[in-house]
Amino acid sequence: MFYDEAKIYVKGGDGGNGIVAFRREKYVPRGGPNGGDGGRGGSVILEADAGLRTLVDFRYRAHYRAERGQHGQGKNKHGRSAPDLILRVPVGVVVRDATSGQVLADLVEDGQRVVVAAGGRGGRGNARFVTSTDRAPTFAEKGEPGEERWLVLELKLLADVGLIGLPNAGKSTLLARISAARPKIADYPFTTLTPNLGVVRLEDGDSFVVADIPGLIAGAHQGAGLGLKFLRHIERTRVLVHVLDTSQPGEDVLAGWRTVNDELAHYNPELARRPQVVAANKMDIPGGEEKVAFLRERLGDSYRIFPISAATGEGVQELLYHVSGLLATLPPPAPVTAPEEEKVTALAPEELTIEREGQVFIVKNPDVERRVAMTYLDNEEAVRRLQVYLKQKGVDDALRRAGAATGAIIRIGKFEFEYVEEP
């Protein structure tokens, strides 16, 4: 079975916790704090692998979590950082954020990697909080939570040429004729249910990859037939070979040509402008010459028409050499990845906002959420330090302006607190 789409959940490993520890050795008075830092959590990384063809590995498992970092130890020993979790995907996978739809990466080269969920940094041990006024801090930090998100993986085959046309036009027969691929071939529509790839090698040494796409019908861009599911696989192709069945009446052949091109334009207008060559197939059946003359009269000089027979091989070599020459003049396809935005150093902190759901006030700010998540809430000194931070950050003032009163519930990230007004 061919699986070209998957939805998965990924989570980077949490950082290891820093610990509270003090040096205790004979003859070493006031040894001081020596709690070590936690290790960094592992990241989840997608890596393109040319040896894979589908996303079937993600069919039976949807959740992937990297390991957390090791906790710190006494004697200033830092915890071990966790290994990254590497998930291998086929070359040609587009990675999107499932919530926003934003393109995160387009993996078009073997070995190309992208971090999709970064691991959290390790929490600092109490030795890192020594100051001139606090020589023996009794608090440390928890590890930073790893990033988590849902992803949509979408495989778009990497091929130079796409064979398009109505069902039963002879696309699979042509692919079998020009390459070593052996797609299923039968005399009924929709024999091809999955895209097939074949490598064409010419006598002059040139070669290119051809994709046979399941037949398109009217309404394919809206989900009719199998078209919508597989139209994505011709988005990367540089040349389209439109296979027409000349055993049909001339007007039907022309109507089929228009139907397929209309579907391409509706799905992606750029596809309709892509270089397209017409392969008038089944010339071994009587009456084909009249159909070719009819097509040339109606299509004019806009499209190069090659009379061929995929069954006998007639005219196929001339078609292939023309396609090879056309490919030599075209640039490689651009990646789907959205252009990288210009990086600007932020001098001001990220905006702090308060959202209200009944008597629950939700504090929104990445820095604040991270600080709360990394605080030992059962440690009195750590909580006092957090309260000072929240006040300096303006959280108290923002809550008062939002109408928070004593007894209200304050939610910061995954934690909830009861609000108490200052006297």
Swiss-Prot record:
Its cofactor is Mg(2+). Residues 336-421 form the OCT domain. This is GTPase Obg. It comes from the Bacteria. GO terms for molecular function: GTP binding; GTPase activity; magnesium ion binding. GO terms for biological process: ribosome biogenesis. PANTHER family: DEVELOPMENTALLY REGULATED GTP-BINDING PROTEIN-RELATED, MITOCHONDRIAL RIBOSOME-ASSOCIATED GTPASE 2. Residues 159-328 form the OBG-type G domain. It comes from Moorella thermoacetica (strain ATCC 39073 / JCM 9320).
